[in-house]
Amino acid sequence: MKLIPAIDLMNGKCVRLFKGDFNKKKDFSREPYEQAKYWENEGAKCIHIVDLDAAKTGIPTNDQSIQKIVKSVNIPIQIGGGIRSLERIKQLFSYGVDKVIMGTSAIENKELVKSLSTKFPSRIIIGIDAKEGKVSTRGWLKQSDVLATELVQEFSSFKIASFIVTDINTDGTLEGTNEVFIKKILEITDIPVIASGGVGSISDLLSLTKFEDSGLYGVIVGKALYENKFTISEASNILSTERINDIPINKDYYA
């Protein structure tokens, strides 16, 4: 299971939201490209970027920061936020981005996503952000009636790289992941899954390792790294060794 550090961009700065609320954001002083380089030096093998401004409005405004990040590191970059057209994807690929994440368009234009996954096999990631099991779109501002599980089943036949599944109610809380939700997703797809939302400790990471054999490819971590709950090097050292006896029991998972 890979640990993937996250950079959320707003007005060219690194920020973190609390439960996806744009009115509850925290700014971090380090420049985005400096943060990316720092994490690469810590041992990160990939960086996850979200353009929050574009996710909200559909208009990309952080491209300068994105390009600086790509030029500053020598590891793959995956990016999401407001990606709703072939033209935008080509533009991001021209910057050197490795994979793009499609969220809102996965619901609003499924045929486009199907076409793009064929045109760019294994370079399209489907981002599924859910609250109470139902998918949210437009930067988490619009709640749909579509179940996350239904969307995963539908897109599992496409040539996508992976699913990123985020439980909005845990995102930015540092209170642990929604393992019940993650388990449900893993049970219905053979596509690699990346979990996001809620990681606040090494114990949270260790607890997720029980899902590796079920298809959990990685976990995205943001706030915990920014607030020095642990470092990438610390987490990587632990995740790369057999620590099954250290995995805490999550009673909800076994319910």
UniProtKB/Swiss-Prot annotation:
Question: What Enzyme Commission number(s) does the record list for this chain?
Answer: 5.3.1.16
Looking up NCBIfam families in the UniProt record yields:
1-(5-phosphoribosyl)-5-[(5-phosphoribosylamino)methylideneamino]imidazole-4-carboxamide isomerase
An annotated GO cellular component of this protein is: cytoplasm
Q: Where does this polypeptide localize?
A: Cytoplasm
Keywords recorded for this protein, A-Z: Amino-acid biosynthesis, Cytoplasm, Histidine biosynthesis, Isomerase
Which PANTHER family does its entry note? Answer: 1-(5-PHOSPHORIBOSYL)-5-[(5-PHOSPHORIBOSYLAMINO)METHYLIDENEAMINO] IMIDAZOLE-4-CARBOXAMIDE ISOMERASE
Q: Which InterPro entries match?
A: Aldolase_TIM, His_biosynth, HisA_bact_arch, Isoase_HisA-like, Isoase_HisA-like_bact, RibuloseP-bd_barrel
Q: What family is it from?
A: Belongs to the HisA/HisF family.
Identify the gene encoding this protein.
hisA
Q: Which Pfam families match?
A: His_biosynth (PF00977)
| Catalytic center residues | 8, 129
- GO molecular function, a single term: 1-(5-phosphoribosyl)-5-[(5-phosphoribosylamino)methylideneamino]imidazole-4-carboxamide isomerase activity
Q: Cite the annotated pathway.
A: Amino-acid biosynthesis; L-histidine biosynthesis; L-histidine from 5-phospho-alpha-D-ribose 1-diphosphate: step 4/9
Query: Which principal EC class is assigned to this enzyme?
Result: isomerase
| Name of the featured protein | 1-(5-phosphoribosyl)-5-[(5-phosphoribosylamino)methylideneamino] imidazole-4-carboxamide isomerase
According to its UniProt entry, one GO biological process term is:
L-histidine biosynthetic process
Question: HAMAP family this protein is in?
Answer: HisA
SUPFAM superfamilies (alphabetical): Ribulose-phoshate binding barrel (SSF51366)
Q: Which reaction does it catalyse?
A: 1-(5-phospho-beta-D-ribosyl)-5-[(5-phospho-beta-D-ribosylamino)methylideneamino]imidazole-4-carboxamide = 5-[(5-phospho-1-deoxy-D-ribulos-1-ylimino)methylamino]-1-(5-phospho-beta-D-ribosyl)imidazole-4-carboxamide
